Amino acid sequence: MSTKVENILEELKSLNLLEAAELVKQIEETFDVDASAASGGVMMAAPSSAPAASDVEEKTEFDVVLEEVPAPKKIAVLKVVRSLTGLGLKEAKDLVESAPKTLKEGASKDDAEAMKKQLEDAGATVGVK
C-alpha cells in the first residue's frame, strides 16, 4: 500500500462519528453516489472473507435504539438525530415520531455510548442493545 493511502487510512481512523457522517455526506454530494447502496455489498463480503473476525465483532457491535421522545424535547432530539445520521429534516422527523426505532446498527461501544449520551442530553430515552 502506498504511503499516501496509508496516511489517508490513518486519518479516517481518527474521525469521530459526527465527522465520519459529515465525510460520507460530502463524498455522496461530490461524487454523486449513494453510500447506502455500497454498504450492502461490503457487509455481505465481510463474513465470507473472515468468519473468525465476525465472532469478535458480534461482541463489540451494538444497536442504538431511540425508545421514547417526550413532546417538549422533540425539536432538540430531532436536531441531534439529524447530526448523528445525516438524514434530512422530514426523514429525521418521521424517525423521531415513530419511536421506538433503531438509529444505528453495528456501532462500536464507544460510538453507541456517545450517541446515547447526546440523545439523552437532548431529552430522549435511548437503549443500547
Swiss-Prot record:
* Alphabetic keyword roster: Chloroplast, Plastid, Ribonucleoprotein, Ribosomal protein
Q: Which GO terms describe its biological process?
A: translation
**CC annotations in GO:** chloroplast; cytosolic large ribosomal subunit
Q: Would the keyword Plastid turn up in this protein's UniProt record?
A: yes
Q: Which InterPro entries match?
A: Ribosomal_bL12 (IPR000206), Ribosomal_bL12_C (IPR013823), Ribosomal_bL12_C/ClpS-like (IPR014719), Ribosomal_bL12_oligo (IPR008932), Ribosomal_bL12_oligo_N_sf (IPR036235)
* Entry GO MF terms: mRNA binding; structural constituent of ribosome
Keyword Lipid metabolism (UniProt): no
Q: How does it assemble?
A: Homodimer. Part of the ribosomal stalk of the 50S ribosomal subunit. Forms a multimeric L10(L12)X complex, where L10 forms an elongated spine to which 2 to 4 L12 dimers bind in a sequential fashion. Binds GTP-bound translation factors.
Family, similarity comment: Belongs to the bacterial ribosomal protein bL12 family.
* Gene assigned in the entry: rpl12
This chain's protein is named Large ribosomal subunit protein bL12c
Where does this protein come from, organism-wise? Porphyra purpurea
Where is this protein localized, as stated in its record?
Answer: Plastid, Chloroplast
Pfam families xref list: Ribosomal_L12, Ribosomal_L12_N
The source's domain of life comes to Eukaryota
Functional summary from the UniProt entry: Forms part of the ribosomal stalk which helps the ribosome interact with GTP-bound translation factors. Is thus essential for accurate translation.
| Chief subcellular location | plastid
